[in-house]
C-alpha cells in the first residue's frame, strides 16, 4: 500500500509540474503576442542572448516555442529589409541599380576550358574534317535504321515505331538475334548513315545507342522518363510526314558540340516549315530532354505549342570512336561518377 501511495504522489507531482509548465508557456506566448500587437519588438538580447542555442533547452514544449519565436523574428527582419529596399528603389526611380540575378546551379556553373567558341579557327577546322562533315556539306542525306535489343516487349516496339514517325527517312528493323557487329556492315552496304538501338530492362526502355556510319562515333545514353503518345495529356494529333525543324540547346563544350552535331545529322537539311513541327534536344545539367511539338498560331502575334510525343530524357554514358565495338573500341569519353561528379556545378556537355 505504501508503494501505491508513493506512486500516486509522484504521478500527482508530475501532473502539477506539467500544468505549471503549460501555464508558463501560455503566459510567455501571450506576452509575445501582446508585444507584437503593440508594435514593440522584444529585445534580441533577452530572447536570444549571445551564445544561446535552442537545442540546449531540454523541455520539448519550451524548445518548440523558442524555435517558433526565432523563426517569426527572422521572417519579420527579412520582410522589413524587403520593404526598406523597395522604398529606396522607388525613391531612386530610374537611377535605381538593376535587380540582382538569382543564383542557380546553371548560372553558377564551373567554367570548362573546352567551351566552344564559334569564331575559333581550330573549331572550324575540326567541323570541316570530322565524321559529320559530309552531312553538313550536304554531300549525304540521312537514312536511319532503328532497332531494339533481343526479344523486345510492346513498350519498346511502340517507342521505335513512334521515333520512326519523328525522324524522316527512318526504318524500323527487328533484331531476330543478330549481333550489332553483323548488323553494322549490312547497314553500311545499304547506305544507312545512322543506327539507333533501343535497349530495355524489365519491359521498360532504359538505354539508347547512337552510331554514326560508316566511321562513327558511337554514343551510349541512359534513357529515362519515357512517355509514349497515349501517356501524354492534351497531346496533338499524330505528326504529319513533313520534315521537322530541329532545335539544339546548351551544347557548349567540345564534347557537347560533338553530341549536338550527332543529333543534327539525324534530320534532313531543309525543314518544311509548313508542317509546323519541331524536334527539340535541350541540354540542362548534362541531361538531354527530347520533346516533339507542333506550333499553334492563334493570331498574327500569339503562338503556342502542342506536344505530339514521344518524350524521354537521355544521359550520356560514353562516346566511342568508330562504330560499335564493346571489346576493342577506343573511347573518347566515359562517365565516371566517383571522379567526375565531385561538384554539382560542374557539367560536361
UniProtKB/Swiss-Prot annotation:
> InterPro entries, alphabetically?
Brix, IMP4/RPF1
Region of interest (RNA-binding), ranges: 303-320
GO CC annotations on file: nucleolus; preribosome, large subunit precursor
Q: SUPFAM superfamilies, per this entry?
A: Class II aaRS ABD-related
The family database entries (SMART domains) matched by this protein are listed as: Brix
User: Alphabetically, which GO biological process terms does the record hold?
Assistant: maturation of 5.8S rRNA; maturation of LSU-rRNA
Q: Which GO terms describe its molecular function?
A: RNA binding; rRNA primary transcript binding
Give the Basic and acidic residues compositional bias ranges. 87-97
Reading the lineage from the top rank, the first entry is Eukaryota
Pfam families attached here?
Brix
Q: Which UniProt keywords apply?
A: Nucleus, Ribosome biogenesis, RNA-binding, rRNA processing, rRNA-binding
Give start-end ranges for the coiled-coil region(s). none
Ranges where the Brix domain occurs: 142-325
Function comment: May be required for ribosome biogenesis.
Entry protein name: Ribosome production factor 1
Q: Which organism is it from?
A: Homo sapiens
Query: Taxonomic lineage per UniProt?
Result: Eukaryota, Metazoa, Chordata, Craniata, Vertebrata
Amino acid at each position: 500500500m505504501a508503494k501505491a501511495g508513493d506512486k500516486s504522489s509522484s504521478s500527482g507531482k508530475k501532473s502539477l509540474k506539467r500544468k505549471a509548465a503549460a501555464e508558463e508557456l501560455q503566459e510567455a506566448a501571450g506576452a509575445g503576442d501582446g508585444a507584437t500587437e503593440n508594435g514593440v519588438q522584444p529585445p534580441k538580447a533577452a530572447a536570444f542572448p549571445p551564445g544561446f542555442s535552442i537545442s540546449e533547452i531540454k523541455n520539448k514544449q519550451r524548445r518548440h516555442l523558442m524555435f517558433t519565436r526565432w523563426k517569426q523574428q527572422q521572417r519579420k527582419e527579412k520582410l522589413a529589409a524587403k520593404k526598406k529596399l523597395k522604398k529606396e528603389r522607388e525613391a531612386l526611380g530610374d537611377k535605381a541599380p538593376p535587380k540582382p540575378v538569382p543564383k542557380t546551379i546553371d548560372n553558377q556553373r564551373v567554367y570548362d576550358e573546352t567551351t566552344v567558341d564559334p569564331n575559333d579557327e581550330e573549331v572550324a577546322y575540326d567541323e570541316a574534317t570530322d565524321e559529320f562533315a559530309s552531312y553538313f556539306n550536304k554531300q549525304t542525306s540521312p537514312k536511319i535504321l532503328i532497332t531494339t535489343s533481343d526479344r523486345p516487349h510492346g513498350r519498346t516496339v511502340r517507342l521505335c515505331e513512334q521515333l520512326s514517325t519523328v525522324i524522316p527517312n527512318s526504318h524500323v528493323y527487328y533484331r531476330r538475334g543478330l549481333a550489332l557487329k553483323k548488323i553494322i556492315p549490312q547497314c553500311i552496304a545499304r547506305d544507312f548513315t545512322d543506327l539507333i538501338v533501343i535497349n530495355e530492362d524489365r519491359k521498360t526502355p532504359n538505354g539508347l545507342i547512337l552510331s554514326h556510319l560508316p566511321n562513327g562515333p558511337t554514343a551510349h545514353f541512359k534513357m529515362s522518363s519515357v512517355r509514349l503518345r497515349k501517356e501524354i495529356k492534351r497531346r496533338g494529333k499524330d505528326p504529319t510526314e513533313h520534315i521537322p525543324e530541329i532545335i539544339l540547346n546548351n551544347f557548349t563544350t567540345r564534347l557537347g558540340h560533338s553530341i549536338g552535331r550527332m543529333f543534327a545529322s539525324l534530320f534532313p537539311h531543309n525543314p518544311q516549315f509548313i508542317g509546323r513541327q519541331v524536334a527539340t534536344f535541350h541540354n540542362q545539367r548534362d541531361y538531354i530532354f527530347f520533346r516533339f511539338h507542333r506550333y499553334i498560331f492563334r493570331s498574327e502575334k500569339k503562338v503556342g505549342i502542342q506536344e505530339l510525343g514521344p518524350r524521354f530524357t537521355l544521359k550520356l554514358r560514353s562516346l566511342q570512336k568508330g562504330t560499335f565495338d564493346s571489346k576493342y573500341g577506343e573511347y573518347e569519353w566515359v562517365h565516371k561518377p566517383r571522379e567526375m561528379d565531385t561538384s554539382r556545378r560542374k557539367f560536361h556537355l
